[in-house]
Amino acid sequence: MLVYLVLCALGEVASWFPISTTVAGHAQRCCDPALGFTLGWIYWLKFIVITPNQLTAAALVASYWVDAETLNPGIWFTIFLTFILSGYKIVVVLGLLILSLVLALGGGPDHERKGFRYWKNQGAFAGEQTPIGRLRAICRTMPSATFTYSGSELIGVTILHSHNPRRGAARAIQLTFYRILVLNLVGTVLLGMLVPYNLDDLANTSRDKVTTASTFVVAVQGAHAAVLLHFLNASLLLFVLSSANQALWVATRILHGLAVDHNAPAILLQTGSTGTPIVALGGCAVLSSLAYLNISGDSRTLFDQFINMSTMFSLLAWISILVTHLAFIRARRAQRVPDKALAFKAPLGAFGSAIALVFCVLIIVSRSFDIVDPGASIRRFDYIAFLTSYLAIPLYVCLIAGYKGFTRCASVSPSEADLGYPNHFFSSRP
């Protein structure tokens, strides 16, 4: 629901402005130039962290074949960065969903119909007996759950490049919502049917190669479908490599856009003969080499740290999008822009964005429940998790305060927001 509300808020604003306007540009026009500046950089940081995160995930998947002690993860990254992979992901995931359903119904080599036995025998909160323990269990899943949906707001790019923004916004949001519903939620349900929570292969606490495998690989192995294991692991490896490639592309585009808007050094504007922003791409690629930290550290630990950072950047980006939408609504009302002039209108309007803002704040606060464990015999404080989870917040505040202090800019008044009305941006578009 949170993701849907964010998508609707973005869809309403993005479908109003012209193609050349970015998400950061929306914030500059409707809310505050400092927020637009900050959103651009936070958005770039989010995707520049996702790239090494996905490369780290690739190392974890590849460790199923060759342990890190035998072949250093740094070797894998040198190989992976030579690939440009995309387009196959939907086919792979749909195949995994069908395979999982067949295995759950007893169609695997073991002919064991698992059904919902793990939902009944162990349950959703197995091992947690107290309300506080169950709350902590929910909070513990928030970073990875939020990370799963991060990037959903990229539909804004689709809307901005649509010839018919009214139709394009609604269709893009619907397709994204259905993708989340089918691929993410259905996949989670099926995995819950196939894999018990306390399976040793999921612990990832030893150096046995099975513990570094994907949950889907563990599910297939549990059904004794050995012939599919290596093929499935290879498919998942290509999956995360494609995600890393996409994140690198988005980060490069955002960084170049920041330079175009004079919010980043002008050297980033340099392009090659084909129009590729080579300096921005090179800078992002260099930062992606953070994945080589696996050479001196545990891949699983580093993977979790990247998720913590990316999750917080995503939440801050969502908060900025929602604040921009609320400012856009205030500006429309102040300038008396009728609803019928909108290319797309968020179904729940300002109320939906306000509710989504509350949920974003709650998710941010909930992270502290897992960082500090007051119920342990020895009070545990994971300072690394704290830093990687919350470092983005002071950075976010410093970017806003620094931009305001340097430029002396003021927040945009609703009556003075540049909405371009009554000369509607799309009045001349087909």
Show which residues each predicted segment covers.
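Hydrophobic transmembrane alpha-helices that form the core helical bundles
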Residues: V3-F80, A244-I254, L316
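Membrane-helix boundary/coupling elements in multi-pass transport proteins
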Residues: I19-S20, I42-T56, S144, Y149-S162, ...
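TM-loop-TM module centered on a large, flexible mid-protein loop between adjacent transmembrane helices
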Residues: V23-A27, D32, Q122-F125, T141, ...
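Transmembrane helix-loop boundary segments of multi-pass membrane transporters
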Residues: W65-S86, F231-A234, L293-I321, D373-Y390
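Transmembrane alpha-helical segments of multi-pass small-molecule transport proteins
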Residues: W65-T82, I90-L96, R113-K114, A280-S289, ...
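C-terminal membrane-solvent junction of multi-pass transporters and transport-like membrane proteins
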Residues: I84, Q270-G275, W318-S389, L419-H424
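Helix-loop-helix junctions that connect adjacent transmembrane segments
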Residues: G87-A226
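Non-transmembrane, juxtamembrane loop and terminal tail segments
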Residues: C409-P430
